[in-house]
From Swiss-Prot:
It comes from Streptococcus agalactiae serotype V (strain ATCC BAA-611 / 2603 V/R). NCBIfam families: aroB. Zn(2+) binds at E184, H246, H263. It catalyses: 7-phospho-2-dehydro-3-deoxy-D-arabino-heptonate = 3-dehydroquinate + phosphate. This is 3-dehydroquinate synthase.
Amino acid sequence: MQVEVDLPNHPYHIKIEEGCFSEAGDWVSHLWQKQMITIITDSNVEILYGESLVNQLKKQGFTVHVFSFAAGEASKTLEVANRIYAFLAKHHMTRSDGIIALGGGVVGDLAAFVASTYMRGIHFLQIPTSLTAQVDSSIGGKTGVNTSFAKNMVGTFAQPDGVLIDPVTLKTLGNRELVEGMGEVIKYGLIDDIKLWHILEEMDGTIDSILDNALAIIYHSCQVKRKHVLADQYDKGLRMHLNFGHTIGHAIEVHAGYGEIMHGEAVAIGMIQLSRVAERKNLMPRGISQDIYNMCLKFGLPVHYAEWDKDVLFDILSHDKKASGQFIKIVILPQLGSATVHQIPLEEMRDYLEK
């Protein structure tokens, strides 16, 4: 199956098919007539898929280089980006060449950031191998690196030339790495796709159930992401709905130390916490927070953060991109399957951090 992202300035397609990674070289050759490609990946994914992709691309006549960095959120930094710039320059990569991001969300965000800034921008493709990347971060053109102050504090908007999603790659993930992706999937059902929410309700929450339903949940998630990106490419309106749970979630990631709490795990905790307080403030119907709690618990996502410190978390989220002056925008749910943006005084976020 295929999802078309029909942006007027940069249309591209998302190919979703079991086993399609084995045809990645052919897919790339139909999109690009470039001479040189650099694959950016991490130390885990390189072992699993690096050699296969290199061989496929060489078979199509491409000159191929590989840059691999230590796996994990701690590598999503300007320091690692600088190392990649040096690698690209050493191999004389030009704007007529291309980058392929092969891996999970960290790889995709970092590789896309590098591609969008090296020589003021070169073309890139996304081949996501984690559930979080397949349903969310590889789509829509947000790139970024972390700082000590905030997650994704430095970044750009840059669309890929295409996205290749093979659900079979999920079978090589560890259980925790697979389950954390369900945080984003649950979010999609909550904000815009009640059919997806019902699919999740029918699943038993096991690893096998995630893998068995992967094609459906990836497709539904990509459709929701596509809708929001087409309506609001630069995150000024509707696309902000995708941030449900992320304001508190990102603060948790920073507080815990990048990589200690995975992104989807932090989003799950953030959705539950924000919803509970929004219900107390009569901004959301009673019971939704419990629905979210139960769904996250069923799939094995964390529902609490043991090191909770509201003052430190508030200081972190005051640097959030959704803050503007003395106000910040949060996403709430009028009902299951629907979202809206609500602006509040930044100081009121302290209420949302009360346990």
